[in-house]
């Protein structure tokens, strides 16, 4: 897979950008803050419908603009698809595919497949569980776009359930002794059923993904850091104890176990005013030997583990039949010689690689020799603020 052309309008620092891209390795050179990462972020947004840098859409829209536009023509095994996304900071985003408006932007998932490695990926190892959950969910949505809808539905149910637990605390505590309490408990039962059904689908997909990813993460880490302890990953849930009695389990067993745990935790949830059971509280244990990587890994081991997660993701998507686009955002300056060499080896075998770097010297020498294209990102101050420019001589 590769992107043949990319267009941006009012995306962050880019009032307008039109660039033709080719298979091979393309690098964007520009000083920090000039807007080079905004280019690859936009491609990643088109692939995942989310940014690797911010959690909301508002920062993606250029100051004083009503919306941002991202358009790309992707080529996959000779077939071209034109994806277009309109990002609205205060309303629902809109999308079209081959100039035909689609019902929801989620229909774009899978059109562009990317794997992005950036300094922010250290948070996969050192950060909060939400980072690791998102890592899994993004891969699942790329491979099974329908699951993005399941996850979105789960999040809506969770929000409604939490709102009930917060606003109807007194009624819930009174229980069936009052009409108000009985109504609140009946509503909670309804949300429990939906939370368990949707949550079981999310969890089953995560379990299945980690079963495939685990060996690839182990292999990637062993290749990158052969002198280190072996890497392993385990999915940690809020219902581990309930699931431990089953040697194998599917979504049905997970759903039943969730319902059992929700019943057991109901009083605590009413007292706390929040949902304590479900995939929104799960985590992925990243292990080096018999120790968790978080808190025990050295800086070099943390980089190796983060890189291994992305390489495993890339290899998994590739095994599905399509080379995803590999995006390397300002990472070579952060890696030691050994890790740089491993990454260059991978990049040389990928259909399309997009790289950002602050200066040309940040690139490894063996990478400079195989570049397909190089672009320079500069900036210009205008009456409406600083804007980014591509290949414009000062």
Curated annotation (Swiss-Prot):
It comes from Corynebacterium glutamicum (strain ATCC 13032 / DSM 20300 / JCM 1318 / BCRC 11384 / CCUG 27702 / LMG 3730 / NBRC 12168 / NCIMB 10025 / NRRL B-2784 / 534). Keywords: ATP-binding, Cytoplasm, DNA damage, DNA repair, DNA replication, DNA-binding, Nucleotide-binding, SOS response. NCBIfam families: recf. PROSITE patterns: RECF_1, RECF_2. This is DNA replication and repair protein RecF. It is found in: Cytoplasm. The gene is recF. The RecF protein is involved in DNA metabolism; it is required for DNA replication and normal SOS inducibility. RecF binds preferentially to single-stranded, linear DNA. It also seems to bind ATP. The keyword Transmembrane helix does not apply. Belongs to the RecF family.
